[in-house]
């Protein structure tokens, strides 16, 4: 593990604000499309400190902000966007939450990221399919004190990140203690860990492990989004529970465990909770 000066800004912001609020693909609904400049602006207006986004790479080497697998829902096409050229992608139209066609197109990542420069922190989620290219691209933007990339724990990805000597902030998706032990072996700029746990008996929530994170200034990220009725990312301390049963039953419990960042689809409500603790 390495500690880079790039990490100081986000760590200090966590301490100042109790915890940080991360907005899942921006804040969307109505005619605001996920993973767009407008969704990210909307998230910031709703109180988010971090916007989460996904990147794909066209066949001719252009990065776009998009979550692959959502092609049919967002673009009304039944084709893997990662197999399209930038010309093909630029010709596609986005569909809104009512599945009505809009005049909006997908946005190129460079344009989106430059608009967010010095405005907030940014988490790059799905991008590990083109790991080396992503790292080089992000390094070229000179925004490494704002941008955090993440990936599943994969030895090949960790080796490539270490070899790149990039100062970009990194956050692994940790599902068990064994994965945490693997990550610790690499000289990478580890700023945070996203902890995935199905129940509160997870060893990742043990006092010993949490103390290790805190002692090493590693931020703890909880994914409180409720994807559906079966996938559990944060031991049922999630958005739906927080809204249905009360903030203290979900987000509040995550805060009590010591989580420094909470990802949500409802940043304004989470900010309301934060303002009142």
Report residues per predicted region.
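Phosphate-group recognition and catalysis centered on beta-loop-alpha active-site segments
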Residues: 1-277
